[in-house]
Amino acid sequence: MEQRVAITGIGAVSPLGNTALATWAAMCAGTCGVGPITHFDTDAFAVKVAAEVKGFDGNDYFGKHDARHLDPCVQFALAASDEAMHDAGFDVEDAIDRERLGVYVGSGVGGMQTLVDNVHTIADRGPRRASPYMIAMMIPNMASGDIAIRHKAKGPTLPVVTACATSAHAVGEAFRAIKHGYADAILAGGTEAAIIPDAVAGFTSCRALTTNPDPSTACRPFDANRDGFVMGEGACVLVLESMGHALARGAHIYAEVVGYGNTDDAYHITSPDPEAAGIARAISLAVAEGDVKPSEGLYINAHGTSTKLNDSSETAGIKRALGEDAARAAHVSSTKSMTGHMIGATGAIEVMACAMALEQGVVPPTINYRTPDPACDLDYTPNRAVRADLTWALSTNLGFGGHNAAIALRRYTRS
């Protein structure tokens, strides 16, 4: 028998705050998490700004000995998983059968800082000086592995890697696994820590990043003057749980996950299909599986990267999937305008925003929106959050390689 799936725990480390609730409060306030890059000297770089995590010290959180053996992306993921487990009430030993608890946490690039540091060490000092922890710290599945070890999760584990759609696919695949009875609960999400010279140089070379040095206008999704995304970092982990298991233990339920679409454009390695057929089909699949009724109050947390190609293509995809009237009636926003693009973590933190929006009846804004673009003609909730009577939410994400994901959620009401 198919199971309904609830979100019962949330955890986040983001450019807006080092907890989920701090992040959500900042989203609702329209806070900009973008600022000058402090992780490295940008004198030789065209890109000057990013959305960095602030005030998170791995040495304080894990202790110096353990922190030095954890790449920053894993540190973020572990901290977010701790918060999510506590929020769900799973930090009590017998709260769940650990063989029925899984981990689906991915990363777009894994421990890139660790890899780069060791490449320089090997080049400068020879191969014998490579760290014995290098491989374990750099591989993108290590966030899932370390979370499983930390929380004794012995159920299904799947570290997803689909670039910018990573954690959306992680949430979707976790939803499917629980729906079909393979687990009672899964820690699902993603993490990234790639605001480093090498990643910024690479994204700049493929003309993906904005070179606007003004943090207050650098990230402006759907605006006519948008010119590239802003790198972000952090992690978000959600506890997805079967509804029956959640109700039996009296868990708090933020929202219900009801549908998932997973497609590929099969068009280009980095550019989205301008016809938007792939993302439209992902949305349609999620809507059909969840029996979503857009006329009953719909919020769409769009991928909205602030790139010329993505935002217009995604707008077309939303209209193609839902129809012009339903698309125009929906509340749409891009929280990347505040968090920057958190790459592997972005899908999960946007699903979190959808769940909180449904529970609290608040749509977070798209900040920095000033000049409408005729190719982006939906209601993007410009600059200020709005109250709304919401029943449904969609989170959409697109990744390099043509990967598309859509997650459908429904407001939970106890019957």
Question: Can you describe what each PLM-predicted range is?
Answer:
Residues 4-8, 32-35, 214-290, 298-299, ...:
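Condensing-enzyme catalytic core mediating Claisen C-C bond formation in acyl metabolism
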Residues 7, 20-23, 28-163, 191-200, ...:
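Conserved beta-ketoacyl condensing-enzyme motif
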Residues 124-131, 169-172, 176, 192-248, ...:
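Glycine-/small-residue-rich "gating" segment that lines the acyl/pantetheine channel
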